[in-house]
Amino acid sequence: MTSEAVFIQVGALADGFAPHGNLLATASLPAGENFTFYVAGSEPQQLVIEDEQTLSWNGKRAPWRATALRPDILFIDFLDPERDNASISAVCNLTQRNATLVYGQLPDEAPRAGRLQPGRTRVALTAVEVRFVFARLDAQPGPLPGFTDALIGMRNQYTYSPTERYEHIYLNDNFYAWQCLDGVEKGLADVDRCHYVQVAEDLYLFVWREKIIPTLGVILIDLQQMRTDGKIMGYQGSDFGALSNFPVGATAKILNVTRHQE
């Protein structure tokens, strides 16, 4: 009889991913560089790089990290200076002059998975919240990113480091299945809520929200270079006392693709 699966906290996951991870080098942005995100019907949001460690988001300061999976694609990630236990990830397409803003929020207590009960409506299957905003990087009209089903049916393998390897199966618009093949979560698997956004040709933003251990993943998947880049956010321990918001990257391999007949 096998032992019961034990899901680990995100802090332990970060420790496992850290040694020799397949991370991109950080992107250097000059002090004073600014990005204005124009959203129809809303006030523009302002991001200003103050120095190599600090940015300003609508006038409030926060530490930041940026990478460039492609020369014209910036991934800027930081903890939300206006909310506790929250982050903002900005994916900027400098060629198309548009962006996707991902606002993530962790619960402040242990989550309870939602389920159907007689006479009641369904509650959320995960306590991790996410909100997407599609914006222009200038005041001129133009194309915006959008949700996509292009990844659905793919079964991919991701190698995050010499010791950490995962498999993903993108099931439908709302869910994907994952399992850890090697690493600190080896033998663990689940089906979790997810979202897909097309950023550019063969480049996708994949966001997932785990229900057992409160976790938010925000990852770019480049099917031309066959690699990924992004971050994972959760709590360091089970006491919900400190956040772990750490970068991740992987090499990618498409194992197969399933297309169901309608």
Swiss-Prot record:
InterPro entries: Calycin, MoaF_C, MoaF_N. Gene3D superfamilies: 2.40.128.20. Signal peptide: none annotated. Pfam families: MoaF (PF10703), MoaF_C (PF17409). Residues 1-13 form a propeptide. This is Protein MoaF. The lineage of its organism: Bacteria, Pseudomonadati, Pseudomonadota, Gammaproteobacteria, Enterobacterales. The gene is moaF.
